[in-house]
């Protein structure tokens, strides 16, 4: 994408730190990824997973009042403690791997059948989808299967030039995360990331008849061209970005540090305004922003502050006609507003309102053009496109097709473009391309004949009344031909953290389940962002239990309305969604028969108590600070999944974890599984009822990949195993 608004809205509105990032927590990537055409030209810098579960690290040893002669003993004790811990970890890891190898045999045949069906749907609906194109001047750039390609915009013969190949350049196995073309198109900068690491490498290519590598910069998160030969970038270390550098590609090459963020709660990245007038250095915590401007006409001058950080105010900056357009939460109500100010007077006291969102409206994305601004909104579960005309000072609202639940904005690097392109989708509807024309003032569906609308699926939008009378949205999908819905299997989805919406983009396996008669329910509980900033605030810190109450109300309403019943109900969650999923297993296990968790965050208290972890301080604005606030500690302990396990009849649980996951350390999941197994066995031994059901607690540890990015094959295998487990547990 061409400017920060897309990533900014998905990131700051959710207060997630490196979005894409799902935060421990954030992972919106539960299911299969596109086998081909995995394109990152549009670059969600805060992609579902750049955000941040604190990676594990051994706590620094503290010596209190060691007397002379005892210091060495303390060291020996420390080494012995660490060694014992490592041995225990290795033993548990080996034991779980052996256990899974035995159990997996019983799922093998069903897993194979599920994989074949998903691949069939993938080949039918998504394999041949065209990669997103980025028009820049007279050329069109796109990425496919590890290649960055270029063609002439007016070439209808399909001629393409290969500019970059991950394999040929020695980056086999890496995927392309981001692409930036210099204004004169002489240079191409791209970042590459492997499945097993969140650290990316930036490769700068000099284009021409024979493109070649000009420079390679390790550990880079975001980067933008200020001029034809001046590149700004942020460095990443331990999942944190706090430094901005400038490097030149002139005759006298040099690199210098431009900006350093001192506050550990803040994460720094950079973007270029749509008209390429300014680079913006964006320093953001989960609730507060500060932006600095670099004039692209004078890229060597010091950055200029827009507005000093003010607690609770998040903002992002665009530029048009010597005015800054500011997307911000400043003012009442505390939802997003579009404001403006002169470049000469950027302080908050000079901000003038342009447009304010209604309450309970989610700003999903925003794109600036020369004379227009387009906002993609969600209200009452439906998507809208609002077009703000700067010249006529008018606002037009267009409701998008009712089947649509998610959208993806295409890249528009030329801000003078007269058309805005985007794709609409839902969990059971493959992406369909649309275009809005500013000149014609109409919405057009592109190539409607290529991807047929799924006709056998019915979408229902419900409202469940939570414990405090708040109405919580639920989106339900089921086959129109299904009868006796109370006997059909139900798969409930939940997330509820960081202001992030549930992932409702197309997944082949979701369509497969619908065809097989399953019911899919997406519970938009508080803590997520489906109803705007307030919805997130009402479900974080001292309000976390509201998300749990919401989830319980949603499941109970579904059952009351005849959508399945407890013995046919399964729950699925990813990363931070594991908090609510794990909590409801403790509080109301009778509502659910089986649970699938992917890299779940299940030990909030222990994680937040360890401030040596890179992201624990940042996470305090989401979960609270239990070290400084005893009330907060007790509150977290009241809902934390790990701390509330007790002997009772639990649902069966299948957990996928990753050995090298930087965001959700495997050690915490191992402890959780051990404690959960013990509780289920204790309960079984106490009750001793004839035919007493003992749930299956399964841990599948993957040696590679992560809950953010996995290869197509790995992701396909994971999904197939999850569904095989659910079918066996629900006996369908």
Swiss-Prot record:
GO molecular function term, any single one: serine-type endopeptidase activity
Enzyme class: hydrolase
Localization annotation: Cytoplasm, Cytosol
Active site, per annotation: 575, 661, 707
Keyword Transport annotated: no
Keywords of the record: Cytoplasm, Hydrolase, Protease, Serine protease
GO cellular component annotations of the record: cytoskeleton; cytosol; Golgi apparatus
Biological process (GO), any one: proteolysis
Similarity field: Belongs to the peptidase S9A family.
Binding partners and assembly: Homodimer.
Record's function text: Serine peptidase whose precise substrate specificity remains unclear. Does not cleave peptides after a arginine or lysine residue. Regulates trans-Golgi network morphology and sorting by regulating the membrane binding of the AP-1 complex. May play a role in the regulation of synaptic vesicle exocytosis.
Name assigned to this protein: Prolyl endopeptidase-like
Species annotation: Gallus gallus
């Amino acid at each position: 994408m061409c400017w920060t608004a897309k990533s900014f809205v998905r990131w700051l509105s959710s207060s997630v730190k490196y979005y894409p990032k799902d935060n421990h927590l954030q992972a919106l990537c539960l299911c299969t990824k596109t086998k081909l055409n995995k394109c990152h030209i549009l670059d969600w810098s805060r992609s579902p997973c750049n955000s941040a579960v604190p990676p594990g690290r051994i706590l620094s040893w503290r010596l209190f009042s060691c007397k002379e002669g005892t210091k060495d003993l303390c060291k020996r004790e420390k080494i012995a403690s660490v060694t014992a811990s490592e041995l225990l970890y290795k033993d548990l890891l080996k034991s779980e791997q052996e256990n899974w190898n035995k159990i997996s045999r019983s799922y093998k045949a069903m897993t194979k059948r599920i994989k074949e069906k998903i691949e069939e749907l993938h080949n039918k609906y998504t394999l041949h989808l065209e990669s997103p194109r980025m028009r820049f001047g007279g050329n069109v750039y796109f990425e496919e299967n590890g290649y960055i390609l270029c063609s002439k915009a007016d070439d209808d013969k399909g001629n393409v030039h290969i500019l970059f190949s991950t394999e040929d350049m020695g980056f086999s196995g890496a995927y392309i995360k981001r692409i930036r073309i210099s204004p004169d198109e002489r240079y191409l900068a791209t970042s590459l990331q492997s499945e097993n690491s969140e650290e990316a490498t930036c490769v700068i290519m000099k284009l021409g008849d024979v493109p070649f590598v000009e420079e390679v910069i390790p550990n880079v998160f975001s980067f933008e061209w200020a001029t034809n030969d001046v590149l700004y970038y942020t460095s990443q270390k331990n999942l944190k970005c706090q430094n901005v550098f400038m490097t030149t590609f002139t005759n006298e090459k040099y690199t210098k540090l431009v900006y350093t963020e001192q506050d550990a709660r803040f994460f720094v990245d950079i973007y270029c305004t749509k008209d390429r007038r300014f680079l913006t250095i964006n320093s953001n915590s989960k609730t507060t922003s500060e932006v600095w401007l670099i004039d692209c006409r004078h890229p060597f001058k010091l950055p200029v502050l827009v507005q000093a950080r003010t607690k609770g105010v998040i903002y992002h900056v665009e530029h048009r006609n010597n005015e800054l357009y500011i997307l911000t939460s400043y003012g009442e109500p505390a939802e997003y507003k579009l404001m403006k100010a002169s470049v000469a007077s950027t302080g908050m006291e000079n901000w003038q309102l342009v447009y304010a969102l209604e309450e309970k409206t989610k700003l999903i994305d925003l794109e600036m053009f020369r004379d227009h601004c387009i906002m993609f909104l969600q209200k009452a579960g439906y998507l809208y496109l609002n077009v703000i005309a700067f010249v006529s000072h008018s606002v037009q609202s267009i409701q998008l097709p009712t089947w649509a639940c998610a959208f993806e904005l295409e890249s528009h690097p030329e801000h003078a473009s007269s058309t805005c392109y985007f794709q609409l989708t839902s969990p059971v509807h493959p992406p369909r391309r649309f275009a809005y024309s500013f000149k014609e003032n109409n919405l057009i569906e592109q190539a409607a004949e290529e991807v047929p609308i799924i006709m056998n699926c019915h979408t229902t939008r419900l409202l469940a009344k939570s414990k405090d009378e708040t109405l919580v949205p639920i989106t339900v999908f089921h086959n129109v031909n299904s009868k006796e819905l109370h006997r059909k299997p139900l798969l409930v989805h939940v997330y509820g953290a960081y202001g992030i919406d549930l992932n409702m983009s197309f997944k082949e396996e979701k369509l497969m389940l619908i065809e097989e008669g399953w019911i899919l329910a997406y519970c938009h509980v508080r803590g997520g962002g489906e109803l705007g900033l307030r919805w997130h605030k009402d479900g974080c810190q001292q309000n976390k239990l509201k998300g749990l109450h919401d989830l319980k109300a949603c499941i109970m309403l579904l059952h009351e309305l005849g959508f399945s019943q407890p013995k046919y109900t399964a729950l699925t969650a990813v990363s931070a969604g594991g908090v609510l999923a794990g909590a409801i297993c403790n509080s109301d296990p009778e509502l659910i028969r089986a649970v699938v968790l992917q890299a779940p965050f299940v030990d909030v208290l222990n994680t937040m108590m360890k401030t040596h972890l890179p992201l624990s301080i940042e996470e305090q604005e989401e979960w609270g600070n239990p070290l400084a606030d005893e009330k907060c500690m007790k509150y977290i302990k009241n809902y934390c999944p790990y701390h509330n396990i007790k002997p009772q009849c639990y649902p069966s649980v299948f957990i996928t974890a990753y050995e090298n996951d930087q965001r959700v350390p495997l050690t915490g999941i191992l402890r959780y599984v051990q404690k959960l197994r013990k509780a289920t066995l204790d309960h079984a031994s106490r009750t001793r009822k004839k035919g007493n059901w003992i749930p299956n607690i399964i841990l599948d540890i993957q040696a590679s990949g992560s809950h953010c990015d996995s290869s197509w094959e790995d992701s396909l295998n994971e999904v197939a195993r999850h569904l095989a487990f659910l079918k066996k547990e629900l006996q369908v």
